[in-house]
């Protein structure tokens, strides 16, 4: 591998609760930084907002509606030139089940 080539692992975290996702990102950064690699992030990505509209009444009153909203927060963490110890520490990390993790190379 040349000095100019960088191997990057991208970790994308998704969750409905932004406090939970920030805690998970901090935990990942703490664990990975102990292995001595360069880290970029957490970088906040755009929040996806979904709005659901439902009728309040089961039969009449079409004008009476209720709206529900679901926001999906995302964070990006980039690990530059990871070593074997870094990847092994990522495999054994435990995060809450409410967080979706996507790893890309």
Curated annotation (Swiss-Prot):
Keywords: Ribonucleoprotein, Ribosomal protein. PROSITE patterns: RIBOSOMAL_S10 (PS00361). Belongs to the universal ribosomal protein uS10 family. Involved in the binding of tRNA to the ribosomes. Pfam families: Ribosomal_S10. Part of the 30S ribosomal subunit. GO terms for cellular component: ribonucleoprotein complex; ribosome. The gene is rpsJ. It comes from Aster yellows witches'-broom phytoplasma (strain AYWB). GO terms for biological process: translation. This is Small ribosomal subunit protein uS10. PANTHER family: 30S RIBOSOMAL PROTEIN S10 FAMILY MEMBER. Gene3D superfamilies: Ribosomal protein S10 domain. GO terms for molecular function: structural constituent of ribosome; tRNA binding. InterPro entries: Ribosomal_uS10, Ribosomal_uS10_CS, Ribosomal_uS10_dom, Ribosomal_uS10_dom_sf.
